[in-house]
Swiss-Prot record:
It comes from the Archaea. This is Uncharacterized HTH-type transcriptional regulator PF0054. One of its GO terms (cellular component) is cytosol. InterPro entries: ArsR-like_HTH, AsnC-type_HTH_dom, Dimeric_a/b-barrel, Tscrpt_reg_AsnC-like, Tscrpt_reg_AsnC/Lrp_C, Tscrpt_reg_HTH_AsnC-type_CS, WH-like_DNA-bd_sf, WH_DNA-bd_sf. It comes from Pyrococcus furiosus (strain ATCC 43587 / DSM 3638 / JCM 8422 / Vc1). Gene3D superfamilies: 3.30.70.920, Winged helix-like DNA-binding domain superfamily/Winged helix DNA-binding domain. Signal peptide: none annotated. Keywords: DNA-binding, Transcription, Transcription regulation. Residues 4-65 form the HTH asnC-type domain. SMART domains: HTH_ASNC (SM00344). GO terms for molecular function: sequence-specific DNA binding. The lineage of its organism: Archaea, Methanobacteriati, Methanobacteriota, Thermococci, Thermococcales. PANTHER family: LEUCINE-RESPONSIVE REGULATORY PROTEIN, TRANSCRIPTIONAL REGULATOR, ASNC FAMILY. One of its GO terms (biological process) is response to amino acid.
Length: 155
């Protein structure tokens, strides 16, 4: 794991709050020149510490009014087949996040959909095309309201 210093940590915390922060804004927070900040940000990107930048959007403007958490209990959580399962799922457009975790359900997927029918179609598709015999159970929860996303308070 790459080592970072206190200044890098401040830059990372500021960028996690606002990925569009300018070099000038960051330089004021840290006390370095914008050129020095630029060098540090580029170094953090090159090292893979900064993995990318994205906007937090209201998916309803894309016609996606429903967000669901899909939890999957794997038949064999230690199977080498897991990476083969996850790679094609990551390419599906509605999927926003995928987590491997401890507990009763080893995979959690956060995805957005137009409606319940499109969610049901998606569940049929992943069961049929991806999960096959790898899933013991699937549990779905619908998000009713989102208060914070990507570190940004939405209230």
């Amino acid at each position: 794991m790459p080592s970072i210093d206190e200044v890098d940590e401040i830059i990372l915390r500021e960028l996690s709050k606002n990925g569009r922060a300018t070099l000038t804004e960051l330089s004021r927070k840290v006390g370095l020149t914008p050129a020095a900040i630029k060098n540090r940000v580029e170094k953090l990107e090159k090292l893979g510490v900064i993995k990318g930048y994205s906007a937090i959007i209201d998916h309803s403007f894309l016609g996606e009014f429903l967000t669901a958490l899909i939890e999957i209990e794997l038949a064999d959580p230690e199977s080498d087949e897991l990476s083969k399962l996850i790679r094609p799922i990551l390419k599906l457009e509605n999927i926003k996040d995928v987590y491997k975790k401890t507990g009763e359900f080893q995979l959690t997927i956060r995805a957005t959909f137009r409606d319940v029918d499109s969610l049901n179609e998606f569940l049929k598709k992943i069961r049929r095309d991806y999960l096959k015999n790898m899933a013991r159970r699937i549990k779905v929860s619908i998000i009713l309201e989102n208060f914070k996303e990507g570190g940004v308070t939405l209230l």
